């Protein structure tokens, strides 16, 4: 398993836990709200992490019970990681299946591991980020471990400012 993936799994897990944990809420600092996106910083063992995140504006199917979904772009300077794109859709993804992100005519593949999915290739991450800066919406399409398809629609209003704020605070 690639080292970047292992590190991503660990850090994304921390971000999710911090995002939902009242105990750790004081460690998580919002540094800007930009329409549908928000930027945060957190210090974990003297490791500063910055990330832009959003929640879906629409989740389908509506009656499917699951935990919250998030789309992230993260920066971890101590590990020389920048522009890391990841998502969680609130359930365990189907094993050995690709999670898709669609924006307009462009499609990007995410590698799924349990509750998280990442773009593993840095060039693809850059292409995806550029697409997000130009688009107004992105859809994340995944399947549960039982095969049920979900689609999370994210607004990209405010993405560029949230992204730039995260990047600036962790450079």
Summary of predicted features, one role per range:
Residues 1-10:
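Bacterial N-terminal signal peptides that target proteins for export
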Residues 10-19:
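Bacterial N-terminal signal peptides
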């Amino acid at each position: 398993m690639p080292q970047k993936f292992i590190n991503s799994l660990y850090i994304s897990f921390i971000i999710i836990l911090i995002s939902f944990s009242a105990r750790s809420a004081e460690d998580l600092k919002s540094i800007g709200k930009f329409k549908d996106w928000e930027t945060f910083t957190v210090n974990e063992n003297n490791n500063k992490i910055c990330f832009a995140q959003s929640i879906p504006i629409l989740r389908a199917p509506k009656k499917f019970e699951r935990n919250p979904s998030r789309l992230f772009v993260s920066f971890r300077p101590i590990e020389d990681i920048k522009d890391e794109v990841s998502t969680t859709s609130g359930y365990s993804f189907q094993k050995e299946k690709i999670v898709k992100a669609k924006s307009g005519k462009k499609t990007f593949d995410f590698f799924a591991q349990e509750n998280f999915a990442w773009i593993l290739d840095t060039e693809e991450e850059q292409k995806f980020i550029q697409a997000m800066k130009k688009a107004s919406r992105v859809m994340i399409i995944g399947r549960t471990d039982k095969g049920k398809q979900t689609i999370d629609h994210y607004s990209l209003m405010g993405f560029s400012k949230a992204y730039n704020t995260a990047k600036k605070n962790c450079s």
